[in-house]
């Protein structure tokens, strides 16, 4: 299986965490896996590696630039509350606990970058005979070597997508949008190019603003549910559908055997915390917290 890993970082974050993340992939992922790093308007750093390639996102995705220019001065499209004449509006029923607040949940401009990184990789990587593209957030850290068969088993041939879902099949409550710090896109699936095109169209047509939330994980969830229900597309949910527990589903899943995800406050802490973990039901992760890396992390988030 020919695999490409992609990530992106915004200006000012290379030294903070992205460099550590990218270096950890190059050091601990199997030889032969290409790493594409998308950058957003800034000059790329000077870290060179034969398997790493920098891509100017704005240069290769002009439709992204058009979308961002169209909405850059609209506070609502950037997650804020102030409405302007002719601007976009949140749906009246949107928000839940965040209703009436500024929130990343509606920051369409910020999170469009990630979407267009992924769609560019899907559209262009198949031409170079790649089998799958794996998105990995730039605030992850691969703390030990990953076997190739582990990655290949995560991305089965019959599934279009592998992701960390947060829909609990036992509760049947509709669930929550996935954790998209890791997503595998199967380039050999007959619907994957349509998926990428439809994802971009939600932004180029401004249809994204018809959804309850506008960040990439929610939009991904919205579109993947359409493909699952209307096109009967198979997906590989390695999160709640596999019995994983906890809000920090990334480290509680089998990915936690090799990778940490420093979401939010964890960036300042330098790792996830012991109280992020929940009892493990799956045999492959029974001894997860006994790994040397997890033994050394702080007990709680501060």
Annotate each language-model stretch with its function.
Residues 1-100, 123-129, 187, 262-269, ...:
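N-terminal anchoring/stem segment of glycosyltransferases
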Residues 12-16, 108-112, 211-214:
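Conserved phosphate-coordination/catalytic loops
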Residues 20-24, 119-120, 217-226:
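Short, hydrophobic/amphipathic alpha-helical patches that form generic packing surfaces
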Residues 106, 110-164:
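GT-A fold catalytic core of metal-dependent nucleotide-sugar glycosyltransferases
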Residues 143-208, 213:
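Conserved catalytic core of nucleotide-sugar-dependent glycosyltransferases
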